[in-house]
């Protein structure tokens, strides 16, 4: 096998490989000799099939297997000999020639790939970060407890006109151009006015109605409504108001806490405090991580493989366009041209790829490992995100090894961040919740995404009971 480097520019490599016809012929003869005692053919005793007859019958198929074996093994051995790590699977280009299968021509193919850049990991002594600490205000706990217990609020029938906060019981029939549509009708549906449970414009037209009223309201489904056949359509709903109920005073006590499954109000407050502290902790973690990544980004400026850059950019760009589509917005609405947006997101892609390589190198040198238990926990976390589909999602991961492999990257990254936290200087700083949240919003931890229009995912009526909390 003759191996010749034909390109070495930056990270790009091209290698030409020539396997002489003589070497192929020798390999084929080995295969034929190895199989002559194993093949049974009518008219021949075992082991007595003439070599030329075997070659005529199986020569091309054997040679095809030999070539596949070479293509499978050669890239790995060549890269090992060259002490190179490819950024992606090498591209293999083959010179097709029918004579090769007959053993009458050299087998020529080439490898095209990019190597991972070589760089030295710098010391971390100079990296200093601020860890913000914010105490949970009692007022925030009070407000969250009230939201939780609002599901226990009772309602009492009232006379007179409805107002925001009241629960209205209605029958409704939706129509498109005068024709009822599927899923557009319900009876004894209950709606708390002001809950934004329905599409924009629906609830507002049920303020100032009384029991016994009938009316027809006109609404327009959002352009990005989840039911495609309704998206952007004008519709009318024939409404019959059957009852108006006013909210009773919300009781915040041990009995109310028991209704949501906790033994006391004090225990409920403990749970709520823990949830809020966990939310703060996630924000603090992201801000710490951002500071570390910013510091690493400033430390390294090596060339990155174009193939990895294109993959990362295409993933980001697809997500950006998907977000814009879901939000019913365009680049012009965001005050930026598509060309400028592409440039900005390409810079982000470069940062992500470079930092990914740096974190990977740090993790390798620190011998960061991912245990099977950690991987299983990550799979179960994914499964829990799809209630009602747990079995299907679990089967997906069982049958898709690459999906499980994709879960390794974020786990590995977080473990590398933990390793760095043990090596850098951290200064705690007490801040208010407002300061914590304000800086979190402004820090742009990921690329900015278009804001979604409020209420675009609401459906007309879903429940027969008042929506609580």
Curated annotation (Swiss-Prot):
Cited SUPFAM superfamilies: FKBP-like (SSF54534), Triger factor/SurA peptide-binding domain-like (SSF109998), Trigger factor ribosome-binding domain (SSF102735)
Domain of life of the source: Bacteria
Transmembrane segments: none
EC number: 5.2.1.8
Residue span, PPIase FKBP-type domain: 165-250
InterPro entries: PPIase_dom_sf, PPIase_FKBP_dom, Trig_fac, Trigger_fac_C, Trigger_fac_C_sf, Trigger_fac_ribosome-bd_bac, Trigger_fac_ribosome-bd_sf, Trigger_fact/SurA_dom_sf
Molecular functions (GO terms): peptidyl-prolyl cis-trans isomerase activity; protein folding chaperone; ribosome binding
GO biological process: 'de novo' cotranslational protein folding; cell division; chaperone-mediated protein folding; protein transport; protein unfolding
Gene Ontology CC: cytoplasm
Family: Belongs to the FKBP-type PPIase family. Tig subfamily.
Region (Disordered) location: 439-469
Protein name: Trigger factor
Keywords associated with the record: Cell cycle, Cell division, Chaperone, Cytoplasm, Isomerase, Rotamase
Catalytic activity: [protein]-peptidylproline (omega=180) = [protein]-peptidylproline (omega=0)
Cellular location(s): Cytoplasm
Lineage summary: Bacteria, Pseudomonadati, Pseudomonadota, Alphaproteobacteria, Hyphomicrobiales
Compositional bias per record (Basic and acidic residues), positions renumbered to this chain: 439-460
Recorded name of the encoding gene: tig
Main localization (coarse): cytoplasm
Key word Acyltransferase present: no
Organism annotation: Bartonella quintana (strain Toulouse)
A Pfam family per the record: Trigger_N
Domain topic, free-text comment: Consists of 3 domains; the N-terminus binds the ribosome, the middle domain has PPIase activity, while the C-terminus has intrinsic chaperone activity on its own.
Its biological purpose: Involved in protein export. Acts as a chaperone by maintaining the newly synthesized protein in an open conformation. Functions as a peptidyl-prolyl cis-trans isomerase.
């Amino acid at each position: 096998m003759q191996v010749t480097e034909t390109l070495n520019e930056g990270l790009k490599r091209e290698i030409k490989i020539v396997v002489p016809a003589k070497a192929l012929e020798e390999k084929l003869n080995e295969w034929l000799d190895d199989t002559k005692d194993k093949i049974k053919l009518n008219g021949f005793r075992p082991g007595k099939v003439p070599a030329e007859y075997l070659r005529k019958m199986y020569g091309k198929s054997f040679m095809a297997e030999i070539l596949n074996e070479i293509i499978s093994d050669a890239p790995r051995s060549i890269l090992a000999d060259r002490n190179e790590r490819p950024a992606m699977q090498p591209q293999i280009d083959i010179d097709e020639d029918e004579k090769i299968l007959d053993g009458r021509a050299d087998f020529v193919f080439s490898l095209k790939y990019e190597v991972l850049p070589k760089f030295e990991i710098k010391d971390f002594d100079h990296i200093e970060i601020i860890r913000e600490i914010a105490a949970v205000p009692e007022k925030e706990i009070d407000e969250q407890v009230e939201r939780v217990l609002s599901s226990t609020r009772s309602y009492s029938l009232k006379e007179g006109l409805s107002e925001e906060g009241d629960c209205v019981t209605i029958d409704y029939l939706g129509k498109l151009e005068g024709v009822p549509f599927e899923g557009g009708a319900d009876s004894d549906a209950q709606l708390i006015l002001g809950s934004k449970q329905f599409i924009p414009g629906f609830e507002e037209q049920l303020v100032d109605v009384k029991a016994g009223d009938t009316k027809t309201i006109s609404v327009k489904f959002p352009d990005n409504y989840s039911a495609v056949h309704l998206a952007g359509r004008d519709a009318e709903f024939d409404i019959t108001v059957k009852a108006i109920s006013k909210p009773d005073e919300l009781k915040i006590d041990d009995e109310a806490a028991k209704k949501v499954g906790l033994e006391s109000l004090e225990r409920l407050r403990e749970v709520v405090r823990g949830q809020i502290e966990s939310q703060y902790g996630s924000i603090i973690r992201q801000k710490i991580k951002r500071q570390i990544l910013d510091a690493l980004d400033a430390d390294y400026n090596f060339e990155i493989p174009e193939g990895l850059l294109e993959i990362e950019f295409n993933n980001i760009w697809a997500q950006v366009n998907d977000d814009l589509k879901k939000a019913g917005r365009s680049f012009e609405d965001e005050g930026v041209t598509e060309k400028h947006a592409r440039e900005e997101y390409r810079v982000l892609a470069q940062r992500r790829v470079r930092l990914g390589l740096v974190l990977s190198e740090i993790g390798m040198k620190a011998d960061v490992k991912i245990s099977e238990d950690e991987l299983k926990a990550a799979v179960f976390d994914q499964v829990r995100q799809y209630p009602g589909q747990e079995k299907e999602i679990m089967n997906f991961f069982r049958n898709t090894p690459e999906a499980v492999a994709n879960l390794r990257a974020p786990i590995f990254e977080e473990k590398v961040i933990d390793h760095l936290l043990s090596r850098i200087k951290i200064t705690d700083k007490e801040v208010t919740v407002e300061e914590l949240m304000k800086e979190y919003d402004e820090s742009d931890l990921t690329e900015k995404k278009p804001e979604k229009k409020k209420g675009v995912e609401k459906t007309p009526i879903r429940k027969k009971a008042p929506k609580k909390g």
